[in-house]
Design a protein with these regions (language model features):
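Bacterial N-terminal signal peptides that target proteins for export
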Residues: 1-8
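Short, low-complexity, Pro/Ser/Thr/Gly-rich segments in the mature regions of secreted, periplasmic
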Residues: 177-198
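Long, charged/polar, surface-exposed segments that mediate recognition or autoinhibition
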Residues: 93-152
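Ser/Thr- (and often Asn-) enriched beta-sheet segments in non-cytosolic proteins
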Residues: 105-107, 168, 180-182
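N-terminal leader/targeting segments
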Residues: 22-112
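Residues at beta-strand starts and edge strands
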Residues: 99-102, 175-179
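A cross-family detector of function-defining hotspots
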Residues: 57-94, 136-174
Length: 198
């Protein structure tokens, strides 16, 4: 018998006699917190948010949000988006039925050329305005500083989150593909370490 045939038969018989290989399941993708069952909502419907935003920021208006067909999570939420301009969008995840906000996002798609600086400045204005809408005690200057701190911490990170009070701030920096800034409510819980003494 030829050496090549012997090797083939040896490998073939070893393959048949060994236990079957089990498929390794890929690592679970992290689910965005607002997609989880029971995720909290802001106490604002999308219409109320838009009205508040536009009243507080007359030079930065949000157009009406349109529902987006998303079969992935239809049972839990409704997705909607509003085009601000060619490279800037607002999107939201809403609780099904109440249309209360689970996540409010501003996405900037970078453009090349001389208009890039102005386009980014406009995107940052919208992002800071979203912060002020959900945290109304912040001044314009404070919201801009907060945004800069978050963007610096989240630079070149696909996901960066920071919580303050009952709000989670999220930055998704995909470099040349775009930048998304989001605000999401979180559930606050009492510490279990309280000893009961007042």
């Amino acid at each position: 018998m030829k050496p090549g045939c012997s090797l083939f038969l040896l490998l073939f018989s070893a393959m048949l006699s060994s236990p079957p290989a089990l498929a390794v399941e890929p690592l679970a993708t992290t689910t965005a917190p607002y997609l989880l069952a029971g995720a909290p909502t802001f106490d604002l419907s999308i219409s109320q948010f838009r009205e508040n935003f536009n009243t507080q920021n007359p030079k930065l208006t949000l157009n009406e949000f349109r529902a987006i067909d998303s079969s992935r999570d239809k049972a839990n939420l409704t997705r909607a988006a509003s085009k601000i301009n060619e490279n800037l969008y607002a999107s939201t995840a809403l609780e099904r039925g109440t249309l209360k906000i689970k996540s409010m996002q501003i996405t900037w798609l970078p453009i090349q050329g001389p208009e890039q600086k102005a386009a980014k400045a406009k995107a940052l204005e919208y992002m800071a305005a979203v912060i002020r809408t959900v945290a109304p005690l912040l001044t314009k200057e404070q919201s801009q500083k907060k945004l800069q701190k978050l963007l610096t911490s989240g630079k070149n990170k696909r996901y960066y989150a920071e919580t303050e009070g009952a709000i989670r701030y999220v930055v998704a920096d995909n470099g040349e593909k775009g930048l998304t800034f989001a605000v999401e409510p979180i559930k606050l819980a009492l510490s279990e370490n309280l000893d009961g003494s007042n």
